[in-house]
Curated annotation (Swiss-Prot):
GO terms for molecular function: imidazoleglycerol-phosphate dehydratase activity. It is an enzyme of class 4 (lyase). PROSITE patterns: IGP_DEHYDRATASE_1, IGP_DEHYDRATASE_2. The gene is hisB. It catalyses: D-erythro-1-(imidazol-4-yl)glycerol 3-phosphate = 3-(imidazol-4-yl)-2-oxopropyl phosphate + H2O. Belongs to the imidazoleglycerol-phosphate dehydratase family. It comes from Methanococcus maripaludis (strain DSM 14266 / JCM 13030 / NBRC 101832 / S2 / LL). This is Imidazoleglycerol-phosphate dehydratase.
Length: 190
């Protein structure tokens, strides 16, 4: 079983995360930001990851530190994963009504994000849409994953939810075990 626990305790956030990469999509997520809980739940469900996440953040200031630090701990959990025999690459194109999200991933040890997300609104509930790209940057830098994404659509809820669903599907694909693979790199290491 590829299961990991990560804690982060700073002056801004206190986070406890449990991740089972080989899960069934069970989740219990409490960040204090209802829409963020919703899209993280979509990530877990569509990625078939069991995810337990308890966060106490400085939301009296804003949601930036909470979103950023969740990206950090989730990234660290995936970075802990043994890279031998994984498929390494994953991708997904997910529609949600008028919105469409495309995500492609390389778990190759080289953190880099190319994201095309232009919000139409500043907020979805108490969630700041400017934090969407920052979440993925925080995740990528800590997971050491190359991540590309593009989102189109009109409804902000649909756009961000489609993006997190596509993220889950692509991560599920990339983390799948294929015994034929060994280390998927001509270098011999990831």
């Amino acid at each position: 079983m590829r299961a990991f626990k990560v804690k982060r305790d700073t002056n801004e956030t206190k986070i406890q995360l449990e991740l089972n990469i080989d899960g069934t999509g069970k989740y219990s997520i409490t960040t204090g930001i209802p829409f963020f809980d919703h899209v993280l739940s979509s990530f877990a469900k569509h990625g078939s990851f069991d995810l337990k996440l308890d966060v106490l953040g400085d939301l009296e200031i804003d949601d930036h530190h909470t979103v950023e630090d969740v990206g950090i701990v989730l990234g660290k959990a995936f970075e802990n994963m043994e890279k031998k025999n994984i498929k390494r690459f994953g991708w997904a194109i997910i529609p949600m009504d008028e919105a469409k999200a495309t995500v492609s991933i390389d778990i190759g040890g080289r953190p880099f994000v190319v994201g095309n997300y232009v919000p139409n609104t500043e907020r979805i509930g108490s969630f700041s849409t400017e934090n969407v790209v920052h979440f993925f940057e925080s995740f990528s830098n800590n997971a050491k994953i190359n991540l590309h994404f593009e989102v189109t659509g009109e409804n902000e809820h649909h756009k961000v939810e489609a993006l997190f669903k596509a993220f889950g599907v692509a991560m599920d694909m990339a983390t799948q075990i294929d015994e034929r693979k060994g280390i998927v790199s001509t270098k011999g290491v990831i």
